[in-house]
Regions:
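Conserved small/polar residues in nucleotide/adenosyl-binding loops
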Residues: 250-251
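Hydrophobic residues at beta-strand termini and immediately following loops
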Residues: 59, 175, 237
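Walker A (P-loop) phosphate-binding motif
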Residues: 43-95, 106-107
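Beta-strand-loop-alpha "switch" segments that mediate conformational coupling across diverse proteins
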Residues: 234-245
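A transmembrane-helix-recognition feature enriched in membrane-embedded lipid enzymes
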Residues: 2-54
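Phosphate/Mg2+-binding loops and adjacent switch elements
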Residues: 94-229
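Hydrophobic anchor at the start of a short beta-strand
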Residues: 87, 171, 234
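A structural micro-motif
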Residues: 54, 85, 132, 154, ...
Length: 252
């Protein structure tokens, strides 16, 4: 068992045992240090955040792991494009070949770089919506400037809730109904990427995997969200298979 798997098991376990409690106590101390660092970073970035000349919409979450951000941003880009807008998706391209230096995956007409350089998700998004530019890079201010030159009139920040260098006009936060608040602790004690109070910045919440949660669970989630951000709109989404795609199996 890996250390990561062991820690995840402890996070989920309501009765971790004596050794587990000691480990969790240590992780809680680290979580406190992590939180202070996150808050300090947010305050510094917030003071210098750039306002772009076109609207910026962020789609993100507050927990580590997948909550459905990619399907959401694809749907949003598709809807905006159908309404006559020219959105562009800005992704960090985590662990991609161009994460540090940045690059254009698609200019809205054709693919410009390989999947290896782009990263799996940005490349998939570029294939899925070929009319929408997709750009990668840690510095999304630079990506935004490139997107505007390509004709974008709306910027979509993929996984943007913790990207504080750019001001946004709409913050959409996805909440996974199966584990909405990351066991109630910040990393590494829990899965929160920043303190719960950060949800006050949100303008819209989308509850994902709603079909997997009881009504009472969703009611509790909504109460917590309303307490933190009474101004925010709360929506629900459902996951369901749309088609089966045949796959080829490769063997060595």
């Amino acid at each position: 068992m890996s250390i990561e798997s062991y820690i995840l098991g402890l996070q989920k376990n309501p009765s971790p045992g004596k050794i587990g409690k000691i480990v969790l106590g240590g992780l809680e101390l680290l979580a406190g240090i992590y939180e202070k660092g996150v808050v300090k970073k947010y305050e510094k970035a917030g003071r210098n955040a750039r306002r772009m000349p076109i609207p910026v919409i962020s789609v993100g979450n507050i927990t580590a792991g997948g909550t459905g951000k990619t399907p959401c941003i694809l749907k949003l880009a598709e809807m905006l494009h159908k309404k006559g807008h020219h959105p562009a998706i800005l992704s960090r391209g985590y662990k991609s070949g161009l994460e540090k230096v940045g690059g254009v995956v698609s200019d809205g007409r054709s693919l410009r770089i390989s999947q290896k350089l782009a990263g799996d998700e940005p490349y998939m998004m570029a294939l899925k919506i070929p009319d929408v530019p997709v750009l990668v890079g840690r510095n999304r201010i630079i990506s935004a400037e490139k997107a505007i030159k390509l004709g974008a009139d709306i910027l979509l920040l993929d996984d943007g809730f913790q990207y504080w260098d750019m001001k946004r006009d709409l913050d959409i936060v996805l909440i996974d109904c199966t584990n909405p608040f990351g066991y109630g602790y910040s990393l590494p004690r829990g899965l929160l990427r920043e303190p719960m109070e950060a949800l006050r910045r949100a303008h819209t919440f989308i509850l994902t995997k709603s079909e997997q949660a009881d009504v009472s669970v969703k009611t509790d989630i909504k109460k917590n969200l309303f307490r933190l951000a009474p101004q925010a709109l709360i929506l629900e989404s459902f996951h369901s298979p749309s088609l089966l795609v045949p796959c080829l199996l490769y063997t060595s």
